[in-house]
Amino acid sequence: KSAVANLMLSGGTTGFPKLAPLEYEQLYVYANAFSEKCNMNEDTKYLAILPIPHKFAFCSPGILGTLLKGGTVIVCDDVNYDSVFKIIEREKVNITSVVPSLLKIWIEVLEWDNSYNLTSLQVLQVGGAPLENRIAEKACELLKCKIQQLYGATESVVCCTDLSDSIETICSCQGKPLLPEDEIKIVDDSGVEVLPGKTGEILAKGPY
């Protein structure tokens, strides 16, 4: 269980492309905890829109989390909004993951085109970049589903909002650490923890 299971692409803290080794136990603990967080079960239908080699679509909870709970994974090979919306409508997709730039296009389309039936969608995860408050609010209004924000690194701890959080909370933060054992603090250049509201470097440690 401590053997390397996957070499996952990451920009890490430097932005320079690299491969991050993830172990079997790490992937299982992470995907299982996230699937519980998203209330996944055998009725879950997850649409993989983003690149599968990325941690977001692969196991946040993504493909791995869905399969752990006995759900169904639908893989999308075209991110064009029309193709995606038709798959959601046809397959009755109830959870998927996007980046803010993609969600912005969805909102722009849905503001003038209400011909798509997206009522099956219950959870929309958004991560990879900051999410504008206006886009988050519009997404809740037009898609009528729960928005979940994510923030984290391929190599380490991830934070996310709860499905029960208010729209105000979802728009103002990236949530809390996924696991109770996760530790996160912000330090200055000397490694000393900074006060709330101050800028610093994020340090994170998890149980895997």
What is each model feature region?
Residues 28-45, 55-95, 109, 181:
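Conserved AMP-binding/adenylation subdomain of ANL enzymes
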Residues 5-29:
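Conserved AMP-binding A3 loop
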Residues 1, 18-21, 48, 71-78, ...:
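Short beta-strand->loop structural element characteristic of the AMP-binding/adenylate-forming
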Residues 93-98, 107-170, 183:
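Gly/Ser/Thr-rich phosphate-binding loop
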Residues 80, 102-103, 131:
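Alpha-helix capping/helix-boundary segments
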Residues 1-9, 16, 39-45:
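Conserved pre-ATP/AMP-binding loop-to-beta segment of ANL
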Residues 170, 185-204:
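Conserved beta-loop-beta connector loops within the AMP-binding
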